[in-house]
Amino acid sequence: MFRAQQNAFDDAVAKATDENLTSENWEYILDVCDKVGAEESGAKDAVAALIKRLAHRNANVQLYTLELANALAQNCGPKIHRELASRSFTDALLRLAGDRNTHQQVKSKILERMEDWTEMFASNPDFGIMEQAFMKLRTQNPNLQPPSKPGKREITDLDRQKEEEELQMALALSIREKSGSAPQPQVESSSSVSAPENQAQAAPAGPVPSGTSAATVSRVRALYDFQPSEPGELQFRKGDVIAVLESVYKDWWKGSLRGQTGIFPLNYVEKLPDPTVEELQREAQMEAEVFGQIKNVEKLLTLLSTRSSELNVQENEEITNLYNSTLSIRPKLVELIGKYSQKKDEFTQLNEKFIKARRDYESLLEASMAQPPQQQFGRPGQPQYGYPGSGAPAGYPRGPAQQHDPQRYFSPRPPDNQPNASYYPPATQSPGPGHTSPPGPYQQQPQQPAPDSYQPVHHRPESTYDQPQELGTSVYDSPVERLQYPPGPSGGQPHYQPPPQQTPQPDFSASSPNLVNQSQSPYPATPVTQPPPPTQQPPPVPGTASGSAPYPSASPSAANYQAYRPPQGGIPNHNPAAFYQ
């Protein structure tokens, strides 16, 4: 007979606060805001529709209604402010907050929104009803109001030392608990230590006291919603479990939640004890039950998909039993999804930290191993060919022979008291009939350098071979000690000096002696008018003679080794030792 008048905003408000929404739909919310501004009585009708939605028993509908009211207060001006600060709307808020069946998160959201509206309406004294309602709600429910954030004070050295001591005590306690079941003498000590811990776990959890070390706490649960006001703070809602990482400030810890890392105040969270053995067994049993129902869920899905549409599900006993058995795992499945989703975020974040730490370590390692280049003075040495020796002395080349640098071969400086005479006859003279040119590494210099270009060497050059061979016994001096012939007779016979030993070519090796260039004779031709030079030639370099060499290379200890014998005619008889002087 008497029917309430239909409100034009009921459908729009119900659409924006639907219980099936997963989050606030701002498209629907803005549609309501536009409609309120377009109609004369839009503010009054919209608030009336909001009061109806606050009476809904679904917590999501109540939360969406509070968000819609806050959006109207921010976008629709003084008209909606007056309706929100009315007695009817504030009484609806107080009634919902005082209901014991109302969700705790809804109560906290009511207190938060009333505080925001009180600050928003503070400039107009006509809207004082909202401030009165807020003070009344805070007095009646002191546990709803979140505490004020503590100041960010730096951690002192004493706090760091205390944290380290607590960490060492926790490690010692865990080691003692693990070894409690082994020797009998340790049973009393372990039981006496674990008794206070069991009492602490049985006690109700509360806010983390100031001064508690993060080294002994692995996770905390949020008691209130926290909105960051500065960069680097972690946002969370009531009931979220935060993994503790480290202490940053005096009453601020650093933690991770859903892949995000930041700091949070200690008075907004409560300490969660580590799970006991019974809790771990209970979780494992719950997971086993969920995974045990996988086959039943697949079987139920197969039966429902293969049956015809005319099948009466209520009359099919098998489908009914499968549905009832699998329906019980739904809450457990949702809980496991949330648990492993958080673990996935934690492992992902741990992997990112490990990658960053590995890159930092590698960069520091490369920087420590890098050495600054040493400045080189003078001409750098060339690499040595042939067999490696103990080190080449000054004057010996350490690389392949350069054609443009004939002075790199070792030659001693001639004495200053000798006459300025050429060691080699002119190249225009033809060789004598008794002169032979031994093959091997002896090559003629392209141009005889001036005496001033010689560098004096006052030590015996070392061989570049592993096993150098001497060609003279103890009776004779070594040919490399003195490289000049003794003064000749008065007849003016030219005297010859053995050419300096040259470094083998780059492709020379001990296993391939035939590769030595044998195309050029190191001794120039002698004058025709002069008597023939000595037929005995200096011995070749050890290791360079091949099978075709006229003089075999042998060590002094070999059986076929023969000492030097002077010729018996045509040439004055000189002592071999004096011959090499």
Swiss-Prot record:
InterPro entries: ENTH_VHS, GAT_dom, SH3-like_dom_sf, SH3_domain, STAM, VHS_dom
Subcellular location: Endosome membrane
Compositional bias annotation for Polar residues: 464-476, 508-521
Molecular-function annotations in GO: phosphatidylinositol binding; ubiquitin binding
Region (Disordered): 176-213, 368-581
Residue intervals of the UIM domain: 162-181
Membrane topology per record: Peripheral membrane protein
Stretches assigned to the SH3 domain: 215-274
CDD domains linked to this entry: GAT_Hse1, SH3_GRB2_like_C, VHS_HSE1
Keywords: Endosome, Membrane, Protein transport, SH3 domain, Transport
Matches recorded under Pfam families: GAT, SH3_1, VHS
Biased composition (Pro residues): 529-542
Entry superkingdom: Eukaryota
GO cellular component entries: endosome membrane; ESCRT-0 complex
Record domain VHS: where: 16-145
Bias kind Low complexity: ranges: 181-197, 370-403, 442-456, 545-559
Single Gene Ontology BP annotation: protein transport to vacuole involved in ubiquitin-dependent protein catabolic process via the multivesicular body sorting pathway
Primary site of residence: membrane
PROSITE patterns in the record: SH3, VHS
The protein's role, per its UniProt record: Component of the ESCRT-0 complex which is the sorting receptor for ubiquitinated cargo proteins at the multivesicular body (MVB).
Family to which this protein belongs: Belongs to the STAM family.
Subunit (UniProt): Component of the ESCRT-0 complex composed of HSE1 and VPS27.
Protein name in the entry: Class E vacuolar protein-sorting machinery protein hse1
Gene: hse1
